[in-house]
Amino acid sequence: MQRWTAAIAQSDGFVFITPEYNYGPAAVLKNAIDWVYPEWNRKAAAFVSYGSAGGARSVQQLRLTAIELQLAPVRLSVHIPVASLWAHFQGGDVEAGLAELAVPAGAMIDDLLWWTAALKTARASAS
């Protein structure tokens, strides 16, 4: 866990990728997030999820956790409906499926990068 904690401490922003299980994020991800506290503080976070409702319910729960950990979750996220995911993997055009995600993913990453830079500057000036 020391390597995990150190990796979080050295990073300025995060993209969490999770499936949705029983209306929530993967337990192993939640456990890994909960293991660390001060290293998350005042850093930006974004979310990519997949599931029956695009994983939206797992992201809702992770946003609440992120706020409690003093992370700053960006508004935009990428939700991949499992029906669309399976269609692409069962002989469908995987490239087309990925292309559909390019615009929302790009907007989310742009937002994450802006907040990451702003919060990094703010953390440095507070030290």
Specify the residue positions occupied by each region the protein language model found:
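Helix-loop-strand module that forms the ligand-binding subsite of alpha/beta enzymes
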Residues: 1-72
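Glycine-rich phosphate/pyrophosphate-binding loop and the adjoining helix
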Residues: 74-127
